[in-house]
Amino acid sequence: MTTQKLPGTDAARHGTGAADLTIMLAAHDAFRRDLTRLARAAATADPSDPARRQSVAAGWELLKRQLHLHHTAEDQIIWPVLRPRLAHSEHALSVLDAMEAEHDLIDPLLAAVDTAFNVAPDQLADVIDALATTLTGHLAHEERDGLPLIGVALTAAEWRAAGRAIARKNGLSDGSEMFAWMLDGIGRDQAAATHGSLPPPLRLLYRAIWKPRFDKTPRW
């Protein structure tokens, strides 16, 4: 099994066949990290401080953007690739159906946080808690039941091809932001595992361009 054993994830413990899910798991951990940052910022930020409001808004918009890219890649590329390979398994298809349905549950919660930020700050803690509960539950479900299907259905080469399709769809701008976002503030071991999964030219771009550009914007 080639998947790195990243802290806080379930898929590495459950096993994923030949597929290297390092990047997928790093994104999941980044969502968990930013949910914690979101709750902390909402509880402590001074709404009368424009700079603080702007930094919290920048972090929140980035979280939403990365979540949209992540779920779009799953719904439009990963799950459709898996479905015909797993058509013989009612259980597998029911898991994929559940993954898509859970994505639909998350979108209204993102909108609710937006509304609370803008016009109902007294509701902010509750809606952030609802988002965190739903999203972390979805991530755990996906790691437990969804991601192992990738190793069942796809070879390592086929999984890499799916990754290239996602990269083409996202483009260099979104892809560079995604890697800088995933590596932001994570521990040394996890950063090394995630960074090491990149081809050498992209590692150089990350150090020279992507990370410095990402760090220019205050967040949270």
Predicted regions and their residues:
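Small-residue-biased structural context
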Residues: 1-220
